[in-house]
Swiss-Prot record:
CDD domains named in the record: BRCT_pescadillo_like (cd17709)
GO molecular function, a single term: ribonucleoprotein complex binding
Protein name, UniProt field: Pescadillo homolog
GO biological process: maturation of 5.8S rRNA from tricistronic rRNA transcript (SSU-rRNA, 5.8S rRNA, LSU-rRNA); maturation of LSU-rRNA from tricistronic rRNA transcript (SSU-rRNA, 5.8S rRNA, LSU-rRNA); regulation of cell cycle
Higher taxonomy: Eukaryota, Metazoa, Chordata, Craniata, Vertebrata
Any one GO cellular component localisation term in the record: preribosome, large subunit precursor
Family of the protein in this entry: Belongs to the pescadillo family.
Occurrences of domain BRCT (ranges): 323-416
Pfam families registered for this protein in UniProt: BRCT_2, Pescadillo_N
Chain residue ranges for the region called Disordered: 289-312, 452-486
Keywords: Nucleus, Ribosome biogenesis, rRNA processing
Reported function: Component of the PeBoW complex, which is required for maturation of 28S and 5.8S ribosomal RNAs and formation of the 60S ribosome. Required for neural crest migration and eye development.
Length: 574
């Protein structure tokens, strides 16, 4: 009744997987084309739970894919295009070999091409899904946009990545959705809030590239091919949400302001407009010009008594968010030629500030360094020869730290030639028991509106504190001597006295704490062996974290003391 008995490895998990070579033969594709197809369709290898069973008893290392994924790829239209491209290459080589140049031109004109629109719709059914998965796409496009025009990558791909990345930056500026920025060894990390989704991407520094040899650029190019299509769709939809023209165009007033005589010297005529957009110093034009409406107010409804606290907290957070968006409103910046212009211009404009630079540095300058309305001059030099009185000369780190602190920090710590404070990461959130550096504590106090003493004032008071400590030590020694003398006198003259008793007042909080500790101890005693083992593991981890935090605190204390000693030595020399 049961039918024929199946052989070993013909049922169960062994039939759910297929090796890479078998999948490739099933699709009739070469290995590079198979990899390319899997990247575009989002198909990835899987590690079976019982690898030996799936591998039919063998322990040889093999790559496995789900059989249902490979069956899904059989119906993909791009597979046919890959085969057509294979035939195209063969015909082109044959025409080259025969030196039939007319045939070469004709075959080139009929080069097979394909679109990835249907794959984008298939992988991202809703627009929010596409926005949520934009982190890697942004990082890859920003990386490719900085590549030199060498043989490693196609020039068209580099130009496309640059155009899409500039479009996205202009959207972030117009929507004021930038939230965090961090300078790391790898590059500059940005975090933005796009339609309620948090996106984090990294952009490389503007240094010359030395292409590594251990990187497969074909795989990277395939990912970039997919990501550029995705980013193009997303940019178009994002521009529509803000009523901006797409492809982006400069505002008519901004276009007049940005006109300069040396445009043809800086870039080709075909690239001038793109370079003006990439300068990020001008606003974009809208489909229907919107009038500024600053009187918009949030509707207020009768507060629910149960959720009154939650509503107040949300209202406070909304106000802080709006305040953060307009951090640099009313401030006018000028960037010296030695500072990272692209990053600073993007950040300053994202928070409502105005920015410009010397016209000889880059196209897109809106005013020069002699403008009397400039409030902040960003420089990265030890000293400035000629300074204008009515502006601050600051190092670039001030801009980044202000964004992360969500307020305008004191400028005294960022003057040219001053030793800069540490650049704290905004992506680190300390938990209970973690080590918090003093700079972070000072910053948290500033955000709450508290005033803490500066390091310089603390250093001046060190000598006074040491003198007070010496006086306290002398008083304690005198007290101990008196106690010893009283003890000796008491041993010689033992006078028995009867004193009235006192009623002991119980501390309720202490009693409650003792009861709580007793309950906890009894609960631990009643635990099962497994639960007790897990509890001990958790407690061990917490204690280890506290020990590490204490070690860091001691190291920091020793470092601060060494710095103070060094300062005193320098002061004595002078």
């Amino acid at each position: 009744m049961g039918g024929l008995e199946k052989k070993k490895y013909e049922r169960g998990s062994a039939t759910n997987y297929i090796t890479r070579n078998k999948a490739r033969k099933k699709l009739q594709l070469s290995l590079p084309d198979f990899r390319r197809l899997c990247i575009l369709k989002g198909i990835y290898p899987h590690e079976p739970k019982h690898k030996k069973k799936v591998n039919k008893g063998s322990t040889a290392p093999r790559t496995f894919y789900l059989l249902k994924d490979i069956k899904f790829l059989l119906h993909e239209p791009i597979v046919g295009k890959f085969r057509e491209y294979k035939v195209f290459v063969r015909r082109l080589r044959k025409a080259y070999g025969k030196r039939e140049w007319d045939s070469v031109d004709r075959i080139r004109d009929n080069k097979p091409s394909y679109k990835l629109d249907h794959i984008i719709k298939e992988r991202y059914p809703t627009f929010i899904d596409a926005v949520r998965d934009l982190d890697d796409a942004l990082s890859m496009c920003f990386l490719f946009s900085t590549f030199p025009r060498t043989g490693k990558c196609h020039v068209q791909t580099i130009q496309l990545c640059r155009r899409l990345s500039v479009e996205f930056l202009n959207y972030v500026i117009d929507s004021r959705s930038l939230r965090k920025v961090f300078l790391s060894i790898k590059g500059i990390y940005y975090q933005a809030d796009i339609l309620g989704q948090t996106l984090t991407w990294i952009t490389p520094y503007a240094f010359s590239h030395d292409h590594p040899t251990d990187v497969d650029y074909r795989v990277m190019a395939t990912f970039t091919e997919f990501y550029t299509t995705l980013l193009g769709f997303v940019n178009f939809h994002l521009y529509q949400t803000l009523n901006l023209q797409y492809p982006p165009k400069l505002d008519s007033f901004s276009e007049v302001d940005l006109k300069s005589d040396g445009e043809d010297k800086y870039a080709l005529e075909t690239e001038v407009y793109m370079e003006k957009l990439a300068a990020l110093s001008a606003s974009l034009s809208r489909v229907i010009p919107s009038e500024p409406n600053d009187d918009t107010e949030v509707d207020e409804f009768p507060a629910d008594p149960e959720n009154a606290g939650l509503e107040e907290e949300q209202k406070r957070q909304l106000q802080e968010e709006e305040k953060h968006k307009s951090l640099f409103v009313g401030l006018k910046f000028f960037l010296n030629r030695e500072v990272p212009r692209d990053a600073l211009a993007f950040i300053i404009r994202s928070f409502g500030g105005e920015v410009s630079w010397d016209a000889s540095v880059c196209i897109g300058a809106t005013y020069n360094s002699t403008d009397p309305s400039i409030t902040h001059h960003i420089v990265d030099r030890p000293s400035i020869q000629t300074q204008i009185i009515n502006r601050y000369y600051l190092q670039p780190q001030w801009v980044f730290d202000c964004v992360n602190a969500r307020l305008l920090l004191p400028v005294e710590d960022y003057f040219p030639g001053v030793l800069l404070p540490p650049h704290l990461s905004p992506f680190v959130h300390e938990k209970e028991g973690d080590y918090i550096p003093p700079e972070k504590l000072r910053l948290m106090a500033m955000q709450k509106g508290e005033n803490l003493g500066l390091d310089e004032e603390d250093d001046d008071d060190d000598d006074d504190d040491e003198e007070e400590d010496d006086d306290d030590d002398e008083e304690e020694e005198d007290k101990k001597l008196r106690q010893l003398e009283n003890k000796k006198v008491g041993q010689k003259n033992l006078n028995v006295k009867v004193t009235a008793g006192k009623v002991k007042v119980e501390d309720r909080t202490q009693v409650a704490e003792q009861e709580k500790n007793e309950e906890k101890r009894l609960a631990i005693m009643m635990m099962k062996k497994k639960e007790k083992y897990l509890y001990n593991k958790i407690m061990f981890g917490k204690k280890r974290k506290v020990r590490e935090a204490n070690k860091l605190a001691l190291k920091r204390k020793a470092h601060d003391e060494a710095v103070k000693v060094e300062r005193k030595k320098k002061a004595k020399k002078h």
